[in-house]
Amino acid sequence: VWEVLKKQTSKLTRHRCEICAGRGRRWPVECHEVWLYDDKTHTQTLVRLIALCPMCHKVKHIGLASVNGEFEEVRAHLMKVNQWPQQSTAEAYIARAFEIFEERSRHEWTLDISYLKQFGIDPATMKRPLAGTVRLLPVMSPISVLPNSDVPFVSEADFDPFDHIINNERVA
């Protein structure tokens, strides 16, 4: 099932990254899940699948990239895509994303993958235990690629390091 969804997502974007329009060296793009987090009900909802080049995908999982010794390269990509000349801008953004991640990791989350129904997948009958209550794992901390830093979020609650921006418009 995942292989089919991956290929479909890649094909829809003509095998280009939805954030930077780039392609990877070994394979063009990877499939990434976009989640909406409700911090009041602690519900994590799958809202979309997107195609990301391997570098943008590593930015989304910068904690894992750091563990793998790729932090500097990934931070440089984050800065390049967002046109941030100051390393301190990227560091502040990453620090804030980790703060939000750490706060969210203190809670148990209900996982809503009903999005998959549109592909003929019934989450209730899946063999793997995807639906239910989960805990976020700090090593896998996702982080977004944002447009230029002058694009404001509506409020602190609206800041979500887990969503992404396409063409300077926030996509949930």
Q: Where are the regions that the model predicts?
A:
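Residue-level marker of positions within ordered structural domains that often coincide
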Residues: 14, 22, 58, 83
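Histidine-centered nuclease catalytic patch
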Residues: 18-51, 60-68, 72
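A detector for short metal-coordination/catalytic motifs
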Residues: 47, 59-172
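A broad "ordered helical/assembly scaffold" signature
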Residues: 4-5, 33-42, 118-119, 132
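A residue-identity detector for tryptophan
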Residues: 2, 27, 33-35, 84, ...
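Short, charged surface segments at domain edges that flank catalytic/cofactor-binding sites
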Residues: 1-16, 21, 40-43
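Residue-level signal for functionally critical sites in structured catalytic/ligand-binding pockets
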Residues: 6, 12-13, 30-32, 83
